[in-house]
UniProtKB/Swiss-Prot annotation:
Keywords carried by this UniProt record: Membrane, Transmembrane, Transmembrane helix
Protein name in the entry: Transmembrane protein 184C
Primary localisation category: membrane
GO CC aspect terms: membrane
Bilayer-crossing regions: 15-35, 46-66, 84-104, 177-197, 210-230, 252-272, 285-305
Record field: compositional bias (Polar residues): 370-390
Taxon lineage: Eukaryota, Metazoa, Chordata, Craniata, Vertebrata
Region (Disordered) location: 369-393, 421-445
InterPro entries for this protein: Ostalpha/TMEM184C
Taxonomic source organism: Gallus gallus
Similarity section: Belongs to the TMEM184 family.
Gene from which the chain derives: TMEM184C
Length: 445
């Protein structure tokens, strides 16, 4: 029998805190014992200091994740948020392990790098799901806007048509990095096994240089598409304060990447040389260790920023339903990713064959993260929800969009804002939007 809101929300947080304290009582003595056993040098001190930052980082991140699971009232918004919040503990833990065991750093760091692409994808999903719920006629709204020109350095390229074309290309631009990064990571592992990777050495005789260039181009284009997407829909996204969220994601991704490039340049020009390896086996190991140490420190600051930027407070409701198991299971559900990739591949195929693409945004109902998220709906959602199968995962519809609530409503409204009568207001505005859209099209022609 699943644990309901009547009990599990009361004991889950104290239980997690207790488990973390027990973990500290086990891990801290082991780290101190390891520090006393080894010769205390730069490498050992760096590993121990990084461990202190790790122990401060993880509880901040886990608390935010736990609070979202406890108040899991908006699955289509909170699922990508939880995935983004996992970035900090994954980055921090991977870097600390790689710092301790330099020989396996290449294998541990690959997990961190793949999750980086996953985070960018989920941020796009978060924005898309919010807009889909808030504005059922989003394509018409975009078509009614002035033509958005490309941003530097692509300002000389032809502009993307406002509407479905722009949405499709922005989302495809983000999704391509989710595919490219794991692919290049697998290539990097193979090159390391055959001895041609040579990480941290800028030379066109090794594979690392080419993979860095490819990853950088793919990452920059993904971030460019995110910026262009925000530029077009800035007014519509203002209620969820996307700038702080975007900076949190962008800073972690870009800072970690470019500081690795900077450290590699320091190795190339001889600032980091064989004369000072500080207990590491090689100069490349020094570069990797320095990168891992800096990431452990940075993740503590990132955890604080994520805690405030991706707060759980807008999702707190007085009458919350759902089981502990469903909330936990939904966090690990990746069916939307498979559906997104399949849908984008089909859309690309339709474009190549000259067939019409499937519309991204199906009609939905209004939702707002801060105000209407907590407001009461006057419409009875029971009749609407009865036609939908109950599932904690929801049903995929478009780019990462789920429309089925966590639980089927009984006497209280489902997630506030999803079945909101204000959606009718948006629907009624569609003739005006269509009229404005046609005028914009005539002006552009």
């Amino acid at each position: 029998m699943p644990c309901t809101c009547g009990n599990w929300r009361r004991w889950i947080r104290p239980l997690v805190v207790l488990l973390y304290i027990v973990g500290l009582l086990v891990v801290v003595p082991l780290c101190v014992w390891e520090l006393q056993k080894l010769e205390v040098g730069i490498h050992t001190k760096a590993w121990f200091i990084a461990g202190i930052f790790l122990l401060m980082t993880i509880p901040i991140s886990l608390w935010g994740i736990l609070q979202h699971l406890v108040h899991y009232t908006q699955p289509e918004l909170q699922k990508p948020i939880i995935r983004i919040l996992w970035m900090v503990p994954i980055y921090s833990l991977d870097s600390w392990i790689a710092l301790k065991y330099p020989n396996i750093a290449i294998y541990v760091d690959t997990c961190r790098e793949c999750y980086e692409a996953y985070v960018i994808y989920n941020f796009m999903v978060f924005l898309s799901n919010y807009l889909t719920n808030r504005y059922p006629n989003l394509v018409l709204i975009i078509e009614a806007k002035d033509q958005q020109r490309h941003l530097p350095p692509l300002c000389c390229c032809p502009s993307w048509a406002m509407g479905e074309v722009l949405l499709f290309r922005c989302k495809l631009g983000v999704l391509q990095y989710t595919v490219v990064r794991p692919f290049t990571t697998i290539i990097a592992l193979i090159c390391e096994l055959v001895g041609v990777y040579d990480e941290g050495n800028f030379s066109f005789d090794n594979a690392w240089t080419y993979l860095v260039i490819l990853n950088n181009m793919s990452q920059l284009f993904a971030m460019y598409c995110l910026v262009l997407f925000y530029k077009v829909l800035r007014e519509e996204l203002n209620p969820i304060q996307p700038v702080g969220k975007f900076l949190c994601v962008k800073m972690v991704v870009f800072v970690s990447f470019w500081q690795a490039v900077l450290i590699a340049l320091l190795v190339k020009v001889g600032v980091i040389s064989e004369k000072h390896t500080w207990e590491w086996q090689s100069v490349e190991a020094v570069a990797t260790g320095l990168q891992d140490f800096i990431i452990c420190v940075e993740m503590f600051l990132a955890a604080i920023a994520h805690h405030y930027s991706f707060s759980y407070k807008p999702y707190v409701q007085e009458a919350e339903e759902g089981s502990c198991f469903d909330s936990f299971l939904a966090m690990w559900d990746i069916s939307d990713i498979r559906a997104d990739i399949s849908e984008q591949v089909r859309n690309v195929g339709r474009t190549v064959l000259g067939q019409p693409r499937k519309m991204f945004f199906a009609e939905d109902h209004e939702q707002n993260e801060h105000t209407s998220l907590l407001s009461s709906s006057t419409q009875d959602p029971i009749s609407d929800a009865s036609s939908m199968p109950s599932s904690p995962m929801g049903h995929y519809q478009g780019f990462g969009h789920t429309v089925t609530p966590l639980t089927t409503p009984t006497t209280v409204p489902v997630v506030d804002g999803i079945y909101n009568t204000s959606a009718t207001r948006d629907t009624e505005e569609s003739p005006e939007l269509m009229h404005n859209s046609s005028e914009k099209a005539l002006d552009r022609s």
